[in-house]
UniProtKB/Swiss-Prot annotation:
One of its GO terms (molecular function) is small ribosomal subunit rRNA binding. PANTHER family: 30S RIBOSOMAL PROTEIN S18, SMALL RIBOSOMAL SUBUNIT PROTEIN BS18M. This is Small ribosomal subunit protein bS18. GO terms for cellular component: cytosolic small ribosomal subunit. Disulfide bonds: none annotated. Binds as a heterodimer with protein bS6 to the central domain of the 16S rRNA, where it helps stabilize the platform of the 30S subunit. Signal peptide: none annotated. Keywords: Ribonucleoprotein, Ribosomal protein, RNA-binding, rRNA-binding. One of its GO terms (biological process) is translation. The gene is rpsR. The keyword Nucleotide-binding does not apply. It comes from Wolbachia sp. subsp. Brugia malayi (strain TRS). Gene3D superfamilies: Ribosomal protein S18.
Length: 91
């Protein structure tokens, strides 16, 4: 995010608000070979759903696009077979 700061001679200078280095995200499912994305693995699927039962987006979980599609399909299958609830908290 850039912010414009007024200089003494009324010209604007672009200043970057971010400090430090941006951490590179590594897919948590690609590093662990033990955990396979399967609709029967409810412990794994529950880590990628919110408290209300919604599927968390990639920007929050850090999962790559390929694994996110597999996760989505596995969660939908598990919901259909009643292994994972559609919603967990009462709204």
């Amino acid at each position: 995010m850039t912010k414009k700061r007024n200089n003494f001679n009324d010209s604007y200078v672009s200043v970057n608000n971010r400090t430090g280095f941006k951490r590179s995200k590594v897919c948590p499912l690609a590093t662990s070979q033990d955990e396979d994305i399967d609709y029967k693995n409810t412990d794994l699927l529950s880590r990628f759903t919110s408290d209300y039962g919604r599927i968390l987006p990639r920007r929050l979980t850090g999962v790559c696009a390929k694994k996110q599609r597999k996760l989505r399909l596995a969660i939908i299958r598990a919901r259909f077979l009643a292994l994972v609830p559609y919603c967990t908290k009462k709204v």
